[in-house]
């Protein structure tokens, strides 16, 4: 026998038993962003490598270690997108969507990072994100956070996630803080682990995000970013906090919160959970006012967030909120004998036409009554319809309840659609 080909490590299949939960999640996401007036944008999976080097930053872990980059037959360096924001900005610039305009956009699709696979972190993962362009004020920061809070409400996980907030200031404020932080770290270089020493000059704010206990202990005495902010930054952040309090969104200010991408400024945030162990961040984002100009467009204020769907699915499963997903099939239509098969197919088609949202499956492949009922039960259907010679002669259909302890019923064919509609 030929050797089986396996899926690539860290790139997983979503099987039929798993897809109903994914579909439910995707439906909630689409409906929620739609209710806020956001429009979908779809971008290619493959982009120029330079796009991510210029946006994410050449000295970030993503660009240095994690991107799937290759040279095509024309000699161009291409990369499987590791995140969605840069592609959205590139598309906005290219098609004139961002020039003197406000845009509220959302996207959903697969992303790729060559990380060490573990639960909740994969090499191909699905990301959902929202991006807003052209609005510089704190009210839009509040809106994207309200939108994310609405997602948790609709998914039933509000009590299991908490919001952490910080502000990184503007470019000048962050540059002054960067110099002060480097000077502090240089004085304590011997305490820094290898990663922190590597980041000390190239991206010192990422040292604040170190998971090393000794480094975190050292940082207790480090300069505080907020001490370097001017009135505009303080006012922006204060107004955001006031708006969140006004709509009842609770938050914690985390002065050590920085994002792993270079393009963020001012507001940054993460929604975190204690239910997933080390993979606690379920949504993250912030403001990135300089990125549009950095990628060749007119300087444009921007804010957004992204979430990995695999991690949300894992959270829903961990909290056992995946149990109320409806059946994949409502009605399973069987036929007892060749003479009844054509009518059974016609009945199934009539039900699909009368009940567009009903999930109707026709038995195919023959078999006796026992075999067909076994298939019906395995399908997860609520009821099986049995069409035999007697039913055919009397213009009736037998309805067998598969999930309830109820007697089989005979229903007139012309009343069947109404009966099924009430049942499901």
Curated annotation (Swiss-Prot):
InterPro entries hit by this protein: aa-tRNA-synth_II, aa-tRNA-synth_II/BPL/LPL, Anticodon-bd, Anticodon-bd_dom_sf, His-tRNA-ligase, HisRS-like_core, HisRS/HisZ, HisRS_anticodon
Intracellular or extracellular location(s): Cytoplasm
Top-level division of the source organism's lineage: Bacteria
A GO term from the CC aspect: cytoplasm
The EC number(s) this enzyme carries: 6.1.1.21
Gene Ontology biological-process annotations: histidyl-tRNA aminoacylation
Pfam families in alphabetical order: HGTP_anticodon, tRNA-synt_His
GO function terms (MF aspect): ATP binding; histidine-tRNA ligase activity
Catalytic reactions on record: tRNA(His) + L-histidine + ATP = L-histidyl-tRNA(His) + AMP + diphosphate + H(+)
UniProt keyword list: Aminoacyl-tRNA synthetase, ATP-binding, Cytoplasm, Ligase, Nucleotide-binding, Protein biosynthesis
HAMAP family: His_tRNA_synth
Subunit-level organization: Homodimer.
Similarity-based family: Belongs to the class-II aminoacyl-tRNA synthetase family.
Entry-linked PANTHER family: HISTIDINE--TRNA LIGASE, MITOCHONDRIAL-RELATED, HISTIDYL-TRNA SYNTHETASE
Name of the protein in its database record: Histidine--tRNA ligase
The organism of origin for this protein: Shewanella halifaxensis (strain HAW-EB4)
Gene giving rise to this polypeptide: hisS
């Amino acid at each position: 026998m030929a050797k089986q080909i396996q899926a690539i490590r860290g790139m997983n299949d979503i099987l039929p038993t798993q897809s109903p939960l994914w579909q439910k999640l995707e439906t909630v996401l689409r409906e929620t962003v739609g209710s806020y007036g956001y429009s979908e944008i779809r971008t290619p999976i493959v982009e120029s490598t330079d796009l991510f080097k210029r946006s994410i930053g050449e000295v970030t872990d993503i660009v240095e270690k994690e991107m799937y980059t290759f040279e095509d037959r024309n000699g161009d360096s291409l990369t499987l997108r590791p995140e969605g924001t840069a592609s959205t900005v590139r598309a906005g610039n290219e098609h004139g969507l961002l020039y003197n305009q406000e845009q509220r956009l959302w996207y959903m699709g697969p992303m790729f990072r060559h990380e060490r696979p573990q639960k909740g972190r994969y090499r191909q993962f699905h990301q959902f994100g929202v991006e807003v362009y052209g609005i510089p004020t704190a009210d839009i920061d509040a809106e994207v956070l309200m939108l994310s809070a609405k997602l948790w409400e609709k998914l039933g996980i509000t009590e299991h996630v908490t919001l952490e907030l910080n502000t990184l200031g503007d470019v000048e404020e962050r540059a002054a803080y960067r110099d002060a932080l480097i000077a502090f770290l240089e004085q304590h270089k011997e305490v820094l682990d290898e990663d922190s020493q590597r980041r000390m000059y190239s991206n010192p704010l990422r040292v604040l995000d170190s998971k090393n206990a000794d480094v975190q202990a050292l940082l207790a005495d480090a300069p505080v970013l907020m001490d370097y902010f001017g009135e505009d930054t303080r006012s922006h952040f204060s107004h955001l906090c006031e708006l969140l309090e006004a709509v009842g969104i609770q938050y914690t200010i985390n002065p050590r919160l920085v994002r792993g991408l270079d393009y963020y400024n001012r507001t940054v945030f993460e929604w975190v959970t204690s239910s997933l162990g080390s993979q606690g961040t379920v949504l993250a984002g912030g403001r990135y006012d300089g990125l549009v100009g950095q990628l060749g467009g007119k300087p444009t204020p921007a804010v957004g967030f992204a979430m990995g769907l695999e991690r949300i699915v894992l959270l829903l499963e961990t909290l056992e909120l995946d149990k109320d997903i409806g059946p994949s099939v409502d009605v399973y239509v069987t036929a007892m004998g060749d003479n009844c098969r054509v009518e059974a197919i016609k009945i199934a088609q009539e039900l699909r036409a009368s009940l567009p949202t009903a999930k109707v499956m026709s038995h195919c492949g023959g078999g006796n009554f026992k075999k067909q009922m076994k298939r019906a039960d395995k399908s997860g259907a609520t009821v099986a319809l049995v069409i035999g010679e007697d039913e055919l002669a009397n213009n009736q259909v037998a309805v067998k309840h598969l999930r309830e302890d109820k007697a089989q019923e005979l229903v007139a064919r012309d009343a069947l659609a109404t009966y099924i509609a009430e049942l499901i």
